[in-house]
Amino acid sequence: MIALVQGRVAAIGLDAVVVVVGGVGMRVLATPATLAGLRVEADCELHTSLVVREDSLTLFGFADADERDVFELVQTVSGVGPRLALAMLAVHTPDGLRRAVAQEDLAALVRVPGIGRKGASRIVLELGDRLGPAQGAAPAAPVAVDDGADVVDALVGLGWPVRQAQDAVRGVLEDADGTAPDAAGLLRAALRSLAGDARG
C-alpha cells in the first residue's frame, strides 16, 4: 500500500494533482481543500490511500492521516465507494462527519452529492461510533471572507487565470445575499462556477 507521497507538484487540476516522485509523475485524486493548499513546482506531502480494482489503480491523497483514515473507514459502509467517500470529505471535515454521524444529522449527510436520506441513514447505522469522537473543537460560525483573496490565490494555484478567479469569487460573494461563506465553501462554489463556464 502507498501510504505517503512526497515530491514536487507538477500540475494541479480540479480534482487531482500530479506529484513527481523519483522522476515518475503520480496522479493523486484529492478534495478541493487539499488541492487548495498545494502550489505548482512546490514540494508537497500527501497521506494516501491506494484503491485497487481489477482494471485500475487509483491513488487518493489527503492533507493529514486522520482525513485518509476517515476516507478508508467510510468505505466500509455498503454502497459507499472511494468516489463517494472523497465527496463526503469535500463537503465535511473528518470532525464534521463524526459529529453528523454521532448526532444522526441526516440533513448534514444528504448535503453530499450522491447521498439520499436512505443512504444517510445507512451511514449512521453502519458507522455508529466507529469514527470515534470529534478530535477538535466544534467549528466556529462561518467567517466572512472580505475580498476572497485567499480563495483567489487557491484558484490561481489550481491553474485558473487571475482575472477569471477574481470574477468567479466576486460572483459567488454577490450571490450570497449577505450570508458569509467560509473559505472552503467559497472555494467549492467558485470551482462549480468556473467548471460551468468551462463547459459553456
Swiss-Prot record:
Role played: The RuvA-RuvB-RuvC complex processes Holliday junction (HJ) DNA during genetic recombination and DNA repair, while the RuvA-RuvB complex plays an important role in the rescue of blocked DNA replication forks via replication fork reversal (RFR). RuvA specifically binds to HJ cruciform DNA, conferring on it an open structure. The RuvB hexamer acts as an ATP-dependent pump, pulling dsDNA into and through the RuvAB complex. HJ branch migration allows RuvC to scan DNA until it finds its consensus sequence, where it cleaves and resolves the cruciform DNA.
Tell me the Gene3D superfamilies matching this sequence: 5' to 3' exonuclease, C-terminal subdomain (1.10.150.20), DNA helicase RuvA subunit, C-terminal domain (1.10.8.10), Nucleic acid-binding proteins (2.40.50.140)
Q: Which CDD domains match?
A: UBA_RuvA_C
Q: Which SUPFAM superfamilies match?
A: DNA helicase RuvA subunit, C-terminal domain, Nucleic acid-binding proteins, RuvA domain 2-like
Residue segments, region Domain III: 143-200
Per the UniProt record, the lineage of the source organism begins with:
Bacteria, Bacillati, Actinomycetota, Actinomycetes, Micrococcales
Residue segments, region Flexible linker: 138-142
Q: What is known of its domains?
A: Has three domains with a flexible linker between the domains II and III and assumes an 'L' shape. Domain III is highly mobile and contacts RuvB.
What is the organism field in this record? Beutenbergia cavernae (strain ATCC BAA-8 / DSM 12333 / CCUG 43141 / JCM 11478 / NBRC 16432 / NCIMB 13614 / HKI 0122)
Q: Which InterPro entries match?
A: DNA_helicase_Holl-junc_RuvA_I, Hlx-hairpin-Hlx_DNA-bd_motif, NA-bd_OB-fold, RuvA, RuvA_2-like, RuvA_C, RuvA_C_sf
Subunit description: Homotetramer. Forms an RuvA(8)-RuvB(12)-Holliday junction (HJ) complex. HJ DNA is sandwiched between 2 RuvA tetramers; dsDNA enters through RuvA and exits via RuvB. An RuvB hexamer assembles on each DNA strand where it exits the tetramer. Each RuvB hexamer is contacted by two RuvA subunits (via domain III) on 2 adjacent RuvB subunits; this complex drives branch migration. In the full resolvosome a probable DNA-RuvA(4)-RuvB(12)-RuvC(2) complex forms which resolves the HJ.
User: Where are the annotated segments for Domain I?
Assistant: 1-63
The family database entries (SMART domains) matched by this protein are listed as: HhH1 (SM00278)
Q: Where is this region: Domain II?
A: 64-138
Query: What are the subcellular locations of this protein?
Result: Cytoplasm
Q: Name the predominant localization.
A: cytoplasm
Q: Write down what this protein is called.
A: Holliday junction branch migration complex subunit RuvA
Query: Which keywords does this chain's UniProt record carry?
Result: Cytoplasm, DNA damage, DNA recombination, DNA repair, DNA-binding
Identify a single GO molecular function assigned to this protein: four-way junction DNA binding
